[in-house]
Amino acid sequence: LKNVFVDKKIAGRYYQEAAIKAVCDSFDTRNRRKALLVMATGSGKTRTVIALCKVLSEQGWVKNILFLADRNSLVTQAKRSFVNLLPDLSVTNLCEEKDNYAAHCVFSTYQTMINCIDTIQDKEGKLFTCGHFDLVICDEAHRSIYNKYRDIFNYFDAPLIGLTATPKDEIDKNTYEIFELENGVPTYGYELAQAVKDGYLVDFMSVETTLKFIEHGIVYDELSPEDKEAYEDTFEDENGEMPDSIGSAALNEWLFNEDTIKKVLHILMTNGLKIDYGNKIGKTIIFAKNHRHAEKIYEVFGKEYSHLTGYAMVIDNRLKYAQSAIDEFSDSKKL
């Protein structure tokens, strides 16, 4: 794997090529079987690993590839990228195609693959033998994934490449141990600060806010009648008793406070990035605590901004057409 040619149409940035060559050097010169790439979100991890797969395939190192991610949407997106950039590669998404096991590049969630290696066919044995794959790619590699799905990594006898956007200094020490690396020293790293400096990514800006309940907790006697009712519904126990106040640390259970949501939405609609010469809010993602919280935010948005019909939508694993909704949101021509 010395002096390999990297397809610059797939991965043309200097750090992408450097990452590919670092993995090749690790596998070939250093005889390692595990590699960890730490690359900032938006820097092209998937493109990098696609170009790497092309290099390893052309050099005769790999034929069958397994790409694992923890969510269906990530599996779908990765498969789509492989198809677009390596159109001659036969691929399958096990989450959608349950009977196409002959493809050279298999995409799957961890749970689906666990089911596959636990399944035995009557005539031909297991769906995938332990030596079926020549390379396993683990998206968002971290200790919790490895611990939860250890059987996958123990079962397949193949080199392992981990991808993560977590800054290298924040990655759990045990994750480095999994990839047999020195703590804080990935196979290759390209982080946000460098990407911003290079002009490939834009740094984030934060808007600091002070919300009474979140910062200082809740005192029942200071609430409005409407919020008192919600407080009672939320915190009253089976004996009809409830605390006089709730500290800010306990408020994760009461993020559904309508007043808090209204204030957060007001801050967003006032200070959020605008389009159409500042006349309307641009595309925005609001991360909720859970599905119920997301539904509450959606409900409050509908009340407060009833003139913006169709502006807000809850997208999570309960939505049957979640991927289509994500695709539409990602389309710059659609709002």
Give short role names for the model-derived ranges.
Residues K173-I281:
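Interdomain helical connector at the RecA1-RecA2 junction of SF1/SF2 helicase-like NTPases
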